Amino acid sequence: MISDEQKQQFIDEGYFILDSVLSNETLELLRGACDILIDRMHSEMDRLGTDQIHISHRNQRYHIAKQYAHVEGLKEYVFGELMADICKATIGKNAYLFYDQYVAKAAEVGRPFAWHQDGGYLGFPHTPYVTVWAAVDDMTAENGTVTLLPYSDVGIRSLVDHIRNEES
């Protein structure tokens, strides 16, 4: 599934793209899980009497973490063959789940995410890890896809200081 060219691109540039590798069944699972998790976030917002929890903003953007074991079917996706193949192709045969999250932006009114390196938020030295980003809806640059910064464009392979954007 992952070609030698994609593996080399990961080494050279820090990323590769697997286009249309999720089955319709998997997409439906991920979409349904996202809906369930957003409903749970709304319930928690209601309980707390707020429209914002951390960087989740009601009906605009949601950041929902560490829930793979709490929605039926997600565990099988997270620990399934596709993720195993990605891990083996990038960081080797020994991989461990470090963090799982949904980032969902509402159509037309979603909030931006500030540019960041995922590792920049950790604040401690760590072993290499891989971030897998899977779109569950059709996307374009205009409607909010992720933007990657290849090594060759940035000119370095190290972390940079992160400045929090209060608007995002």
Where on the chain are the PLM-derived regions?
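Conserved hydrophobic/aromatic beta-strand scaffold that supports enzyme active sites
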Residues: 15-17, 131-135, 148
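Short, charged/polar surface micro-motifs in flexible loops or helix N-caps
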Residues: 83, 107-109, 138-141, 154
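Non-heme Fe(II)-dependent double-stranded beta-helix
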Residues: 1-13, 19-115, 121-124, 161
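Structured loops at beta-to-helix junctions and adjacent beta-edge loops in soluble globular domains
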Residues: 21, 105, 118, 135-137, ...
